Amino acid sequence: MPKIAVVGGTGIYNPDTFELIEEVYPDTPYGKPSDKILIGKIAGVEVSFLHRHGTTIPYPPSSVPYRANMWALKELGCKYVISACAVGSLQEEFVPGDLVIADQFIDFTKRRDYTYFDDKIVHISIPDPFCPYLNSVFEESAKKLGLKYHMGGRYLCIEGPRFSTRAESHMFRNFADIIGMTVVPECQLARELGMCYCSLATVTDYDVWKEDDAVDIDMVKETMARCLNNVLRLLEDGLPAIEDEGCVECIEAAKGCGAL
């Protein structure tokens, strides 16, 4: 079974680049995942692809079954989770169209299922929540491909589904670089399960801190569609470079706090 999972939107599943082998829709202790998991190959590498927001039942960010999603991928044997997502920019130098390989997150969500340990005290350690090994793999690929990217970025995760007010956006600029709605709790659930996690984020807009700019879903979709090829190229180059035992830090962190 695949050791690598890719979580993203419809565009990532491209019949021209994704060789479909089978579809599975497993049950988990937390219900069904957000969609069927597509098992196939990208650049000759076997992967499990999951549409985070679903295709038959549309899940807004607050309602995504994050626990079921990560659990299902773990049960399929995945060790590595690569998230492809859209983000807004909170800093001038993070320009729409840029790729960001995030290295930290700040959590401003409010009503999600954050842990698998509701009946047990487990304090997961995530000082560095994104896998340094995976980040380094995709940094090398981005560099090789000549893509405009940022190695490192503080991802601020808001509840959604609404976008920020201008006051919020100005406040967020004081401590974050990019803003989105999906990394939390996906990232920390992966850590609880001992899976490595990285986020390949495409900047689609400047949020609303620029007085003449505003963000809407059409703008996000338009920019994401225009830049999708960069994400696909990054996956095609980076996935074959991921080694089976490339990282032990993430699983050791989960074991160290009693999560595994």
Predicted ranges, named:
Residues V208-G258:
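His/Asp/Glu-rich mid-to-C-terminal helical/loop segments that flank catalytic regions of hydrolases
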